Amino acid sequence: MAEERSLNGEATGQDDESFFDSDQQGDDGKSTELNQKIGDLESQNQELARDNDAINRKIESLTAEIEELRGAESKAKRKMGEMEREIDKSDEERKVLEAIASRASELETEVARLQHELITARTEGEEATAEAEKLRSEISQKGGGIEELEKEVAGLRTVKEENEKRMKELESKLGALEVKELDEKNKKFRAEEEMREKIDNKEKEVHDLKEKIKSLESDVAKGKTELQKWITEKMVVEDSLKDSEKKVVALESEIVELQKQLDDAEKMINGLKNVVEEPLNGIEFKSWSPNVTAVGSGGAVAAVAVAVAGAAVVCYIYHSRRV
């Protein structure tokens, strides 16, 4: 009878050990799978962080290039303003030349008027001389009124001398005006030549600057398009990164919960490990110390509790039969 009870007790102990071994293997598999999943998520998070850093560096580079293009555009605009001011200055010089040309025209008119007065004075002198000759002829013919005629002749001579003096003054003025007119024409010609050369140079510089501005504007437009493209890509990556971060946060919360459950299971298992073999009324209780490292869920913990309760019932029945 005692041998039968001993055999029944050994069979019951073997069944309990096989039950706990299968549960331990399931918990180890779940813990390994969970750790692998955590490692994969951490690797994905690091890869997304590296991609985000690369995109940020590219955006900074494009931003610096656009700022450089804006500086070149501003410099070109300042140069354009200087060229416009020089053109305005050239317009003022042109106005001066036009004033000189107007003055030269006035001088030409004055010269023509003086020439007309000179011709008129010569005509009057010739007429006075003819009149004097005529008077002399009349005096010689008539022989009377010689004194009066001589006075008239003297007066006419005075008029003639004054006219001749005036003619000399007019001729002197005319010569001076002609010299001045020639100088003015030479100055005007040289100034016009210089002005044409300056205007041609300025127009060439303005054309070159306009072409450069067009090129810069094209580069700026390309830079803006590229920047918009990178901004769009950045927004897409940032949205993906936000989704990944949300997934990581959710997984981290799940990991924390699983870790909490794992800690609770380990505490329960450690409590079971501390069961000491003590005889009670002649009955021997075997301590159970399974090699459990992780528990994956609350169901495993419940299974452990049920197994412990079953072992306690078996021990109680065995003790009752002996009594």
Curated annotation (Swiss-Prot):
Chain segments carrying region Disordered: 1-55, 73-92, 120-143
Stretches assigned to the Mitochondrial intermembrane side: 319-323
A GO cellular component annotation in the UniProt record: mitochondrial outer membrane
Keywords annotated in UniProt: Coiled coil, Membrane, Mitochondrion, Mitochondrion outer membrane, Transmembrane, Transmembrane helix
Residues exposed to the Cytoplasmic side: 1-297
Superkingdom of the organism of origin: Eukaryota
Transmembrane feature ranges: 298-318
GO BP term, pick one: mitochondrion organization
Coiled-coil intervals: 28-278
Record localization: Mitochondrion outer membrane
Its membrane topology: Single-pass membrane protein
Biased composition (Acidic residues): 13-26
Chief place of localization: mitochondrion
Quaternary structure note: Homodimer. Interacts with PMD1.
Function description: Involved in morphogenesis and proliferation of mitochondria. Does not act redundantly with PMD1. Is not involved in peroxisomal proliferation.
Miscellaneous comment text of the record: Plant cells silencing PMD2 show enlarged mitochondria.
Designated name of the protein: Peroxisomal and mitochondrial division factor 2
Organism: Arabidopsis thaliana (Mouse-ear cress)
